[in-house]
Every structure is written in structure tokens, then in C-alpha cells.
């Protein structure tokens, strides 16, 4: 019988409820890893039935946790509202406890003829508004409606029993909470109205006049101010420029101001090209012992289009002739052709004739 490795045993249903969502997902990954191993599942006696059951339970538990989490996220703003309401109710309860402590004072006021709980509420509200310094319109309307309903009632209602002081104090505290909320809303409204009142629309003519006046004021202020130091330095440098220092060069005579002035005067006068060439040559002779080679060709000249085309054609023709000669020479070298003088009779025939002539001369001498 094969046993599951440690950490991969199927969990008991009671344990799943106590686990967190991250732990449940980790357990689900382990079960999936076991289910992928088919050889291991085939070796089990129940063929992995327990693993499948635990896998399904884990999936159901994860789905339930996600559903609870989603509902809690949806109900989060509602819970915040409920907390705020609970705080307000707690404040009201504290106020009722304080009011119950002051019951004897309220009872003495209720014994006075012609006085009712509504009058007490009105007096307390007016004192509160005087202390805050900001009465609200809605609160006044509510108090007027209450007074109207009380006065409109039958005379027998005045003879009835006066309501207890605890109910009056509770109503008073609830009304105070509502009045505080109305005060905050009215303060926001007043702030918005103040911001709107600060916005002003001006004409273009008035704006231009304001701009001109501001420019005049700035001009007067700038006229009275002193120029900055760097502006004065720049103006002085523009009036009295500093002579530029020439860089040191080898094989060059030191620069002199008189020579430069005389050179400027000479340059102003017209000089021919031959005179300039002669001066340049003299200058080279003064500064160096080297001599330029004589020119073998004429200097460059400006030619017309027709002359340039004719020269290009002539050059192309010479180039082709030279290429043909080189090609013929290379071909002859490959074929091993040698140009020699041709003698059809050969050297032997010539020698024979020369010998025969000698014999003839010898025979003639004998005779």
C-alpha cells in the first residue's frame, strides 16, 4: 500500500475553515501536482479517490472565500457609513445621560404655567445659535413648524400631561447633530460664494491702461537704478578694443605693428599678379632656404565645353590604343611567338657556296 508523501495528505473539512486563502491555494497546487503524476495515482488502492475529493473540497472552499471577500469589498462603504452612524448614536446617548442628570432643573421649568417642552427646546436652540454665531434657516423653519403645530392643537392638549424631560433632551441632541451637519454644508456654500465673488471681469481698455501704468512705473524705477557693472565693462571694451595677440609660428618673423600698418597700406593699392608672385617668392627666400621645383606644366586654365569634349575624346582614343598594344603583347607571350628573320635556303647552302667560290679561285690559280 502506497502512502502519500508528507504535506500532500487530504485535509479534514474542519481544517479548511480555519485556513487562509493563501494556504488553501498552496494546498490546491499540491493536490494538482499529485494528480498530474498518473503513475503514482494508479499505484494507490483507491486510484486517487481521496485526492480527487480533497481537490474538489479545496476548490469549493477557495470559491467560498473569494465570494466572502468580494461581498466584504462591496459592503465596505456601507460598513463605514454604519460606523459613522454608530458614533453619532453614541454621542446622542452621552447627551441623553447628561440630560437625565439635569432632570430636576427641567422639571421645575415644566411646572411653570404657560411653559412647555417646545419652549425649552426653542430657548436652548437660540442660546446655542448665539454661542456659535451662525444660525441656519432650516433649523428656524423646523422650530416654526413645531410651534405652529403646538399652537394649532386643541386646548385640551395643553391640559394633558407635559412630556418627560428625557424625551425633550434626546430630541434636542438629535436636532443639534442635524444642525451641525447643516452648518458644515452652509460653510462650504459660503466659501464657494466668496470665491465666486472674488472673480472679476475687466474691460480691455482698463487692462491696457493698467499695463501702461505698470510700464511707466517700471521705466521710472529703471531710470533711477544704476547700470550694472558688466554693462559698463562691455561698453568700455567696445570703445577701446584690445589688440589681438598673434599665435607663435615657426619659421615666421616676429610680427610688428608698423610692418602690419605698412602692409595694410600696400594692400589697399592695386598690385599686379606678377608683382604679387615676385613678393611671395621673395618672402619664401627670406624665411626658408628651400627652393621650389620648376613647373613642367602650365597652370590650370578655364576651357570651354567644346574644347574639353575634344580633349576627352583624344585621351580616350590614346587610352584604347595603348590597351590594344598591351593585349597583343600579352597574347604573343602566351603563344610563344618570336619575330625573327626568315632564310629559306638556310645557313648550310650559304656556307657551301662560299667554299665553292674558294675552290674555284684555287683552281684558277693553278691554271
Swiss-Prot record:
| Record field: transmembrane | none
UniProt-annotated stretches for the region Interaction with Pol II? 226-297, 314-339
Q: Which GO terms describe its molecular function?
A: transcription elongation factor activity
- Identify residues that carry Phosphoserine: 269
Modification note: Dephosphorylated at Ser-269 by the PNUTS-PP1 complex, promoting RNA polymerase II transcription pause-release.
Q: Which InterPro entries match?
A: GRINL1 (IPR026213), Tuftelin_GRINL1A/MYZAP/CCD68 (IPR051375)
Instruction: State the coiled-coil residue ranges.
Output: 15-40, 300-329
Q: Where is this region: Important for transcription repressor activity?
A: 29-68, 298-313
Top-rank taxon of the source lineage equals Eukaryota
Q: Where is the composition biased (Polar residues)?
A: 117-131, 176-185, 205-225
Return the Acidic residues bias intervals.
Answer: 357-367
One Pfam family in the UniProt entry = GCOM2
Q: Which GO terms describe its biological process?
A: intracellular signal transduction; maintenance of ER location; transcription elongation by RNA polymerase II
Q: Where in the cell is it found?
A: Nucleus
List the record's Gene Ontology CC terms alphabetically: I band; nuclear envelope; RNA polymerase II, holoenzyme; transcription preinitiation complex
Q: Return the annotated region ranges for Disordered.
A: 117-185, 203-225, 254-281, 335-367
Any idea which UniProt keywords this protein has? Coiled coil, DNA-directed RNA polymerase, Nucleus, Phosphoprotein, Transcription
Assembly notes? Component of the Pol II(G) complex, which contains the RNA polymerase II (Pol II) core complex subunits and POLR2M isoform 1. Pol II(G) appears to be an abundant form of Pol II.
Task: Name the protein family.
Answer: Belongs to the GRINL1 family.
Job of this protein:
Appears to be a stable component of the Pol II(G) complex form of RNA polymerase II (Pol II). Pol II synthesizes mRNA precursors and many functional non-coding RNAs and is the central component of the basal RNA polymerase II transcription machinery. May play a role in the Mediator complex-dependent regulation of transcription activation. Acts as a negative regulator of transcriptional activation; this repression is relieved by the Mediator complex, which restores Pol II(G) activator-dependent transcription to a level equivalent to that of Pol II.
Protein name (database record):
DNA-directed RNA polymerase II subunit GRINL1A
Task: Give the classification, highest ranks.
Answer: Eukaryota, Metazoa, Chordata, Craniata, Vertebrata
